[in-house]
Amino acid sequence: GRNDKGGMSQLTFFNGDRFYTLNTVTSAASELYMLRLGANDPDFNLRPSTAFLVREPAAKDHTFVTVIETHGHYDILKETSKDLKPLCKDVRIVSDDAAKTVVEVAYGDYVLTLTVDHKDASKTGYAVLKK
């Protein structure tokens, strides 16, 4: 699949009694794949597993950013679900160079800014701002 506009792509799945959403920064050139590992194993030596892959075919140096959000709940006795929709509104790379990477995550009424210093890990940090 593709997100021709770029920005953020989301994939929500259900596991156990919870919902999980992968919020991934993508570009218009990004290729998104749902995979089934072990599907072509004629001897059935591999455990069948599913996977999600983001590929940047033309990139030589690329930063991948994915935020995994746990949300919602399925009540097996009542057969009802609540909070199915993720609260993450946006994930974006503000800046990215050899020195540091800055990412913003809009979540509900808050914006989380994450800074990763590639040269000095002690300068890596985060800040939460209310809109």
What residue ranges belong to the model's regions?
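CBM-like, beta-strand-rich accessory domains located in the C-terminal region of large
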Residues: 1-131
